[in-house]
Amino acid sequence: METTEGLLAKVNDIESKLPKLESSINNLRKENEMLRVELNKINENLQDIMALYEVVSNQINPFIGVSKITATSLEKLERLETEYKRLKKTVEELTNDLIILGSLYLHQLDINLDEIIEEVLEEEIIKSMSGEDTHDTKDNK
């Protein structure tokens, strides 16, 4: 009898613990699924990082040749530098041509630029000393 009563008590004890165990198992399954999702996200992020690493290392790695992207960029940069030098030279030549043409024009018309500058400066000095202001907005409506 005792053994039967003891066994019944143990069965009742197990039956009372069974819902708690089922609840714990369900919680563990949910946590396991959440961990699986997080691991998948980590795996995807790691794959993205590795792809980025490969792109960067292919462009910068000194142990491999110049990548196609870097070579193309260097080519474009060299072309831009050549074009810049050409344009700079052209601007310098045009500036020199303007100076020469301006000098010829002034010489042909017998214009003394130094005298003109001197006259304008004298006029401005006289105006400023007399109190006239050529930049006064009230008088220049």
Curated annotation (Swiss-Prot):
What Pfam families does the entry give?
Answer: FlaC_arch
Q: What does the UniProt entry say about where the protein is found?
A: Archaeal flagellum
Tell me the leader sequence span. Answer: none
InterPro entries documented for this protein? FlaC_arc, Flagella_assembly_related
Q: Which UniProt keywords apply?
A: Archaeal flagellum
User: Where is it chiefly localized?
Assistant: other
User: Do the record's keywords include Oxidoreductase?
Assistant: no
According to the UniProt record, one GO cellular component term is: archaeal-type flagellum
**Sequence similarity:** To M.voltae FlaC.
Supply the name of the protein: Putative flagella-related protein C
Q: Which organism is this entry from?
A: Methanocaldococcus jannaschii (strain ATCC 43067 / DSM 2661 / JAL-1 / JCM 10045 / NBRC 100440) (Methanococcus jannaschii)
